Amino acid sequence: LNKEELVHILSARTLDGTIPGLYQALQNGHAQAIKSYGNLVLDTIDKNIDLEYLISAFKYETHSSNKYTPGLFSAFQNGHADAIKAYCGVLGNSNLTRGEIIRMLEARNYDGAPGLLLAYQNGDINTIQSFFDSLIMLDISKDFIEELLTAKHYDFTG
């Protein structure tokens, strides 16, 4: 297999190419699958651009590559605290830059809404606490923790 074929296989996207397997695991709260997938990808892929593509787990809206939702966003939406913790563990074990990790932790959808905002709206204390604990585990600076926990909605739609 060449690198492109391997990345395609590891993305485990649906037949129409819009939904990656990791997105589905995050959406459905399959923490062990997230850990196992993360280990497989981290052991197999060495280029950050491919790693970021695979771990970001963007679901693209049908017929629009401009509209996407990260898997972590769906985990927040559905209150999957263990899945969020597992995902953060994968990020912590990766060689992604601090900036790349923070961008993924924001979990913003195509219109700028951060995933954590949904946990706040749902009053999901367990998910919020799990995310906070994960930020500490990832050794994220206090300033970035404050920014992430503020969960500001930036309107990207213009």
PLM region spans:
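Ankyrin repeat domain, specifically the short helix-to-loop turn at the C-terminus of the second helix
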Residues: 1-9, 36-56, 86-104, 129-148
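Start-of-repeat signature of ankyrin repeats
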Residues: 17-18, 67-68, 112, 155-156
